[in-house]
Amino acid sequence: VLGNVLVVFPAVLALAALIALATGHPAISEKQAEHVFESLHLLGPSLFFAAFTGVLLFASSIIAGWTENWFVLHRMDSALHYNPRITGLLGAERAARWARFLRENLSGFAANISLGFMLGLVPAFAAFFGLGLDVRHVTLSTGQVAAAGATLGLQVLQLPAFWWAVASLPFLGALNVSVSFYLAFSLALRAQNVSGVDRSRIYAAIRARLRTAPLSFFVPERRGPLATTAQG
């Protein structure tokens, strides 16, 4: 999460600068920039929308799991590897590489593609039915803040609305991650038929980890060659 945010913000700033340089106009208008800050205000409905986005993240992981299970169940990697037409077109070695690549990365493709569709279509369907439901993905919201800031220039630093939007970003990320993690964790406990006593121990371990190393839930641990060798 943190890595995505740190990459997206300067990348969007650079892209907005290129668009302004090439077209002579900012990537988004000043009115749109002001609307971005209003929609991401910390005291608005953004936190609720971020929690709902966590549900969509969980749903995309379910779709990814289904896709990978289907791929493995039907032995699609073997079908791609040994299919005469595919091997005749690509060659045996290249067909094997494609089969291995899809076996290792198909779930990631399914998760990202399905999440993209849901982030784009769910608000549209919700608006059609008059639900007023929106999504707040921390990475996309960070990009919106960067684009709006690029439009308004340095004067944006003097706007309280900008700082309210920036302040909301950590909470959006925390809700995205925590809601999707909770749903995935609950599903895993049910799938493994974990008893109530064992669940209490697991919850206690998670709370202890939150107290001692809260950033580990957002920033992955670095594992060097020595740690990998020791575990092996």
Where are these regions (language model features)?
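Catalytic or ion-translocation cores adjacent to nucleophile or general acid/base/metal-coordination motifs
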Residues: 6-90, 132-151
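Long, compositionally biased intrinsically disordered regions
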Residues: 59, 75-232
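Hydrophobic alpha-helical transmembrane segments of multipass membrane transporters and ion channels
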Residues: 2-7, 11, 52, 110, ...
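Generic low-polarity alpha-helical segments
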Residues: 1, 30-32, 113, 232
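Membrane-water interface at transmembrane helix exits
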Residues: 3, 12-20, 65, 127, ...
